[in-house]
Amino acid sequence: MYTCAKFVSTPSLIRRTSTLLSRSLSAVVVRRPETLTDESHSSLAVVPRPLTTSLTPSRSFQTSAISRDIDTAAKFIGAGAATVGVAGSGAGIGTVFGSLIIGYARNPSLKQQLFSYAILGFALSEAMGLFCLMVAFLILFAM
């Protein structure tokens, strides 16, 4: 057991590990491959490299014309899907006032109560339509 520990913990390995642990993670990932010397072939240890502090990114962030076209198409698709809610609002308003007419035809004595419920249904449906329209404009012009 002591022989294995002595073999595994050679001074060059300890030096290499301490150098590796003292670097930041991105410096370790971005580093270049190391070369082995004749001395390191004989002792199976890697020659330690000097600590580099400059971290150069491997690729810079670029947007191409294709990705801009995809973003524009996604905006239009999202705005179109949000505009469908405005059509749903129109259908809801038609349903509310159609139900008002049917209810008034069945029981004319409930005119005032039916009308107040119709106004409430109209307001809720219109609010949802305006919300969908606002989301469509936000998708088009704010993103």
Swiss-Prot record:
User: Would the keyword Mitochondrion be found if you checked this record's keyword annotation?
Assistant: yes
**Modified after translation how?**
Trimethylated by ATPSCKMT at Lys-111. Methylation is required for proper incorporation of the C subunit into the ATP synthase complex and mitochondrial respiration.
Molecular function per GO: lipid binding; proton transmembrane transporter activity
The membrane-spanning stretches of this chain are 84-104, 119-139
Q: Which portion of the chain is the transit peptide?
A: 1-68
Q: Which UniProt keywords apply?
A: CF(0), Hydrogen ion transport, Ion transport, Lipid-binding, Membrane, Methylation, Mitochondrion, Transit peptide, Transmembrane, Transmembrane helix, Transport
Which residue positions hold the site described Reversibly protonated during proton transport? Answer: 126
PTM-bearing positions, type N6,N6,N6-trimethyllysine: 111
User: What SUPFAM superfamilies has UniProt attached to this entry?
Assistant: F1F0 ATP synthase subunit C (SSF81333)
List the Pfam families: ATP-synt_C
What the entry lists under Gene3D superfamilies is as follows: F1F0 ATP synthase subunit C
GO (cellular component) term, any one: mitochondrial membrane
Listed CDD domains = ATP-synt_Fo_c_ATP5G3 (cd18182)
InterPro entries in UniProt: ATP_synth_F0_csu, ATP_synth_F0_csu_DDCD_BS, ATP_synth_F0_csu_sf, ATPase_proteolipid_c-like_dom, F/V-ATP_Csub_sf
According to its record, how does it sit in the membrane? Answer: Multi-pass membrane protein
BP GO terms, sorted:
proton motive force-driven ATP synthesis
Taxonomically, the superkingdom here is: Eukaryota
Tell me where it resides: Mitochondrion membrane
Q: What else is known?
A: There are three genes which encode the ATP synthase proteolipid and they specify precursors with different import sequences but identical mature proteins.
- Which disorder does the record name? This protein is the major protein stored in the storage bodies of animals or humans affected with ceroid lipofuscinosis (Batten disease).
What the protein does comes down to: Mitochondrial membrane ATP synthase (F(1)F(0) ATP synthase or Complex V) produces ATP from ADP in the presence of a proton gradient across the membrane which is generated by electron transport complexes of the respiratory chain. F-type ATPases consist of two structural domains, F(1) - containing the extramembraneous catalytic core and F(0) - containing the membrane proton channel, linked together by a central stalk and a peripheral stalk. During catalysis, ATP synthesis in the catalytic domain of F(1) is coupled via a rotary mechanism of the central stalk subunits to proton translocation.
| Subunit and interaction comment | F-type ATPases have 2 components, CF(1) - the catalytic core - and CF(0) - the membrane proton channel. CF(1) has five subunits: alpha(3), beta(3), gamma(1), delta(1), epsilon(1). CF(0) has three main subunits: a, b and c. Interacts with DNAJC30; interaction is direct.
* Recorded family membership: Belongs to the ATPase C chain family.
Question: What is the protein name for this chain?
Answer: ATP synthase F(0) complex subunit C2, mitochondrial
**Which species expresses this protein natively?**
Ovis aries
